[in-house]
Amino acid sequence: MKTIDYNKRAEYLAKELLGKTINCNGHKYMITVTEAYPFDEKCEEGKEISYVNRSKRGKGHDVLTGKDKIGTCFVYGGMLHIACKGGMSQKWENEYSCDNILIRGAIKVEKDRVIQECKTLNFVTGNPYVLCHDKLGIVSNQLLINLCDGNVFSDVIIVDYKSYADENIKSCKRVNINNDSKLRFYIDKDCILKEI
């Protein structure tokens, strides 16, 4: 089984997570849509978004600060995020800030088959809260991914399931973000429908 390397910037890892499965509390969902959020991304005023989060005491700041957060998943705004490699923020005494990836869409997998249950799990038209809380049953925050020390296993496991060729992975602007970056990635719908 291929290991997922979380020591990559969000814009690369977000594409690689497409086709992987999230296993949690006995449920399995294939990731179909992701959004990358680089730590050093600038907002409309030209400030780093991580700086804005800290100055506004944003909840996302604590779970994205420090190299020890790489490979951690967390629920923020009712949605599942994954912290990955970022860099040093110059604004706050060279503090390490992680990039993060939002899991915006997923499809249920049962008995190694993709199940067409997209209405509640297509987060553009559905409610992202449904996947995290109702379907996967994630209630706590800052969960390590794929942790196994012999006695303790993590609550959330992300594993290799399918790989998609670059021509089957599309990109566009992120939802509710006012810049031109195409950091939203998704598997071509026609490609998924062939598997159902």
Say what each PLM segment does:
Residues 1-196:
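Conserved, well-structured core segments that form or line functional sites
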